[in-house]
Structure formats: structure tokens, C-alpha cells
């Protein structure tokens, strides 16, 4: 039987409780789930890639999936190219709303055409739908406490950023 290998990618800047929920739920469907932290040249990150990897790995220790989940980073490549190198059997994407669906439908088409790799979509739980990294960065930039929506270790790192600015 072929091993089921998934790949869930993002910038995770910062990591949210919504991301963790998708990772936990998706890991139940794979023998191995890679979580790829990728650099996005169109975004100005709060945290460098290595720090985001460190924060995700720490947050995962609180979930019971660390034996199945491996965090990887990549500075510059298409998700589908990484997926081919890792023998991924399915890409993992999350959908919070209709805007996500429209964007992901387009990506689904090209990913499937270029690699033949299917994409599995996980709907965000209703209470996690509003969460996204952009909103967390915006709220944090205006001095708002986002600790209810991000893992504790991420909240701690955001507070450190604030201290460094003083």
C-alpha cells in the first residue's frame, strides 16, 4: 500500500490557532504530513523563516501529532516542485470563506495540471474562520492583544518584538 504523504504550505507569519487546527485534522489522514514554511516575496514578514519554523515546531509539541508532522522550509520554489521531490500524494489547503475558495480553485487547477497531485480542502471550524495571519499582524501592529488567536509561544514572541521596539 502506498504511503499517504501530505503537504500543507504557508508563510505562517504569525502562526494562528486556525493553522494548528488544520495541521492536527489533516495529519489524521496521512502517514506523513509535511508543513512547509515558505518565503513569500510579496509579504514583509514579522519573523524570519527560521524563527517561524522554530515557533511552529514548538507549537506542535502541544499536539499529539509530532510523530507524523515534519516542518520544512523553503526560500524559493513552487509548492508543486517541493511536492514532487517529497513524493507527496496530496496537497492540503484550508478554506475559511468564499474568497479562499475562489483563490484555491485556481491554484487547484494548476497544481493538478502540473503534477497530477490532488488537493484536499479542509474547512475552517466556524469559530476559527476569522483567523488569518494578516489580521493578526494588523491587530498586533496597533497594539492589540492577539493571544486568544495564536499559540502561547507565538504570543510570547510577539511580546518580545514589542519589547525590542521600545
From Swiss-Prot:
Binding positions for substrate per the UniProt entry: 11, 43, 79, 93
Membership in a protein family: Belongs to the bacterial CoaD family.
Cited function: Reversibly transfers an adenylyl group from ATP to 4'-phosphopantetheine, yielding dephospho-CoA (dPCoA) and pyrophosphate.
Enzyme class: transferase
Molecular function, one GO term: ATP binding
Signal peptide stretch: none
Binding site for ATP: 11-12, 19, 104, 128-134
Pathway: Cofactor biosynthesis; coenzyme A biosynthesis; CoA from (R)-pantothenate: step 4/5
Alphabetic keyword roster: ATP-binding, Coenzyme A biosynthesis, Cytoplasm, Magnesium, Nucleotide-binding, Nucleotidyltransferase, Transferase
Protein name: Phosphopantetheine adenylyltransferase
Subunit (UniProt): Homohexamer.
Compartment(s): Cytoplasm
CDD domains reported for this sequence: PPAT (cd02163)
Cofactor: Mg(2+)
Site annotation Transition state stabilizer: residues: 19
One GO cellular component term: cytoplasm
Source taxon at top rank: Bacteria
Reactions accelerated catalytically: (R)-4'-phosphopantetheine + ATP + H(+) = 3'-dephospho-CoA + diphosphate
Gene Ontology biological process terms in this record: coenzyme A biosynthetic process
EC code: 2.7.7.3
Entry keyword annotation includes Transferase: yes
Amino acid at each position: 500500500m502506498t504511503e499517504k504523504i501530505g503537504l500543507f504550505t504557508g508563510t505562517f507569519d504569525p502562526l494562528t490557532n486556525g493553522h494548528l487546527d488544520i495541521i492536527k485534522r489533516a495529519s489524521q489522514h496521512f502517514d506523513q504530513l509535511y508543513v512547509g514554511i515558505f518565503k513569500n516575496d510579496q509579504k514583509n514578514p514579522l519573523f524570519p523563516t527560521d524563527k517561524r519554523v522554530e515557533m511552529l515546531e514548538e507549537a506542535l509539541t502541544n499536539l499529539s501529532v509530532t510523530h507524523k508532522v515534519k516542518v520544512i522550509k523553503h526560500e524559493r520554489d513552487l509548492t508543486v516542485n517541493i511536492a514532487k521531490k517529497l513524493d507527496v500524494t496530496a496537497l492540503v489547503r484550508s478554506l475559511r470563506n468564499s474568497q479562499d475558495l475562489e483563490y484555491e480553485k485556481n491554484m487547484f487547477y494548476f497544481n493538478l495540471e502540473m503534477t497530477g497531485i490532488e488537493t484536499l480542502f479542509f474547512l475552517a471550524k466556524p469559530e476559527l474562520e476569522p483567523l488569518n495571519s494578516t489580521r493578526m499582524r494588523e491587530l498586533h501592529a496597533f497594539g492589540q492583544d492577539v493571544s486568544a488567536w495564536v499559540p502561547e509561544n507565538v504570543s510570547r514572541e510577539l511580546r518580545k518584538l514589542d519589547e525590542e521596539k521600545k
